[in-house]
Amino acid sequence: MMPFIEIDHVDRIFPLPDGGRYIALKNIELKISQGEFISLIGHSGCGKSTLLNMISGLDKPTFGGVIMEGKEITEPGPERMVVFQNYSLLPWLTVRQNIALAVNRVLRDLPKPEQEKIIDDNIALVGLQRAAHKRPGELSGGMKQRVAIARALSTRPKVLLLDEPFGALDALTRGNLQERLMEIVQESGVTCIMVTHDVDEALLLSDRVVMLTTGPEAHIGQILEVPIPRPRHRLEVVNHPSYYALRGEMVYFLNQQKRAKKVGAVSQFAEAMGGNGLEKINLDLGFIPLTDCAPLVVAKEKGFFQKHGLEQVNLVKEPSWQAIADGIRERRLDGAQMVAGMPLALTLGMGGKTPLPMVTAMVMSRNGNAITLSKKFAEAGVKTLEDLRLKLAETPDQVSTLGMVHPASMQNLLLRYWLASGSIDPDQDINLMRLPPPQMVSNLEAGNIDGFCVGEPWNSYAVKQNLGYVIATDLDIWNGHPEKVLGMREEWVNKYPATHLALVKALLEACEYCDDRRHRQEILDYLALPQYVGTSTEYISPGFLTEYDQGNDAEAEMLLDFNQFYVKQSNYPSRSEGLWILTQLARWGYIDFPKNWVEIIERVRRPDLFGEACRHLGWPDLEGDHHNVSLFDGMVFTPNDPLGYIKRFTIHRDIQVTEILIDQIDQVNQ
Amino acid sequence: MKKVEAIIRPFKLDEVKIALVNAGIVGMTVSEVRGFGRQKGQTERYRGSEYTVEFLQKLKIEIVVDEGQVDMVVDKLVSAARTGEIGDGKIFISPVDSVVRIRTGEKDTEAI
């Protein structure tokens, strides 16, 4: 069904006097149904009123649009009435005349007596019959606001837009007016969108509270549903069991944003330095020899680094993901290609380490992994997850071991997810061993492990050597999951903003190059070189260029999505996906779930830096964030309720929720 | 093989054409079409809330490509045809069973 009002990917960008641009709102997406009451909360200057103005038609979005009943809103109209904080009454007219002005203009086709009746009804609705002939100067603040509401309602609008309507009123008047407003809304069934700073007010009045992050590039951070039944009363809502939990969540959100604002002041600097050349042209970037290191190889070999002024980029081949993490920590590496969860894990200090704030401005690849099992399972007839469960249950005294590359890798998280969805507890029914990717096959051959989940070429290698077969690829688990990301220390990005931007641009262009299948043969030859993956193209090619052979009865088939580098907005560092990773790390007890997850995700996953690079390249940077994620088992992850998602899993470890303050620790370090 | 049909804004044709040619596309068919989408094709309003459905002038581009090129073509199309405002159009992708080149009788991939 078409929503009543749809705010469709709205950006609002203001030009600055110095020729720059200030991105106030970024990618706002919201669907509102008829009769709903929505509150917008957020810190001052985050763009709440700008958003309201765009719904009213007083302002226009730079990109995207607001659609009401299937029509784009391009100008103000009487079906959308605004109530401002400062009343905006005409001082030389009486209460009645102020309202009559609106009615006579908008409803001029109605006969006079009917117009009169509407005016009287609305005055009665806000209880101002006695003051009908007073001028605004003779009224109290609360009365003036009631006149403004009556005026807004008198034209029978479909939408009432309230911009901090009760901001200037004393507590008592405010309380009374809130109750009146609720009654009026209930009677007229009008849809309301209200901007407010007051969390109690938002809870009392709204069906949903939309919380905006602090600008620049403000977006929807979280949406809270308010399940309190109507009619509500000011004194009774506090008794509802969810009231304080919701209130706490809102206050907590605002506090997180306050901290984020202080950090944001530093990253503003980044944009200012943009055009002045690069700060550092010699970079050491870490990578692991895997097929999906292709963007780094291409950026170097095809001159994308050079093109963007990065003249001496050294690609450092590392033995394991742990070595990459250490290299970043020890500052031996400027940055690295990382498994998707690693920047978050480093930021949170996973494994008892000091938190090290990291930044991910782009995803470098999606998909490209598979789960390979030893041939002995094939001989036992294991073809599906269910077969595997039965096989494992047959021999409870024998624990099988599977290899994975790093706790924060998608290989680990997807393998665990896959096992658990088939009722195999990855910590109890099976043993997981951590091994670097290039050592997987030799360990499988030696019998140290019975299978593994890893990126290519190691699955195809095992298949071609007739050591194992692929029971599932990640296309079967989560097609399009983020796989490798660019990970840089936040402190580094703040110090070398222009260099970082150049690096992201070079890698984005390299990613685009990698995804053109006409280039794949050439890339294959580069990857096979000893300084990169260093194996025969025969093993790298399946999935990347040619048919993917699972090593079972099934015929090898072309998997066009198997290595995604650019298409389908692969490079967007989605916050929702980052949050999914946090839920899984917490699910398996690697981390305490950060109570301040909004703050953590916003710090690490940086669509704003991604967008900046895209704009420099003239690419569209738009992609909906804050979207649901669902994997092969159909369970839906909504970014508004991460803890609820973890708890819905049958198999999970004990979940601890802790606030993780990355900055305070950061300051102690310096 | 897949057919990619894109409905775009008429003034975007040149940009789209250049982007597709650069992506290695060797042929396309363009036609003038009229239609409406979610917007019901217009932004005029008469007195309050009375609306009519109007058709808008658009261009339709049809391209037949190998399966492996579809994502790339779609991405190029989106990049080139996008203005960010409502009414940028849509892309439809459908399977193609067979292609025959009339002059030579060549089939499928050779015929594209």
UniProtKB/Swiss-Prot annotation, chain A:
| A Gene Ontology biological process term | nitrate assimilation
Q: Which GO terms describe its cellular component?
A: plasma membrane
Q: Where is this region: Linker?
A: 255-278
GO molecular function per UniProt: ABC-type nitrate transporter activity; ATP binding; ATP hydrolysis activity
- What is the main EC category here? translocase
Q: Which NCBIfam families does this entry report, sorted A to Z?
A: ntrCD
Regarding domains, what does the record say? Contains an ATP-binding N-terminal domain and a NrtA-like C-terminal domain, which are connected by a segment containing an abundance of glutamine, alanine and positively charged amino acids. The N-terminal domain is required for activity and the C-terminal domain is involved in regulation of the activity.
The entry's family comment says: Belongs to the ABC transporter superfamily. Nitrate/nitrite/cyanate uptake transporter (NitT) (TC 3.A.1.16) family.
Question: Under what name is this protein listed?
Answer: Nitrate import ATP-binding protein NrtC
Question: What is the originating organism of this protein?
Answer: Synechocystis sp. (strain ATCC 27184 / PCC 6803 / Kazusa)
Q: What is the lineage of its organism?
A: Bacteria, Bacillati, Cyanobacteriota, Cyanophyceae, Synechococcales
From Swiss-Prot, chain B:
Its recorded name reads Nitrogen regulatory protein P-II
The entry lists its GO molecular-function terms as:
ATP binding; enzyme regulator activity
The subunit structure is:
Homotrimer.
Q: What does this protein do?
A: P-II indirectly controls the transcription of the GS gene (glnA). P-II prevents NR-II-catalyzed conversion of NR-I to NR-I-phosphate, the transcriptional activator of glnA. When P-II is phosphorylated, these events are reversed. In nitrogen-limiting conditions, when the ratio of Gln to 2-ketoglutarate decreases, P-II is phosphorylated which allows the deadenylation of glutamine synthetase (GS), thus activating the enzyme.
* PTM sites of type Phosphoserine: S49
The similarity annotation says:
Belongs to the P(II) protein family.
One cellular component (GO) term of this entry: cytosol
Keyword Protein transport present in the record's keywords: the answer is no
Among Pfam families, the record links this protein to:
P-II (PF00543)
Q: Which SUPFAM superfamilies match?
A: GlnB-like
> What's the PTM story here?
Phosphorylation dependent on the nitrogen source and spectral light quality.
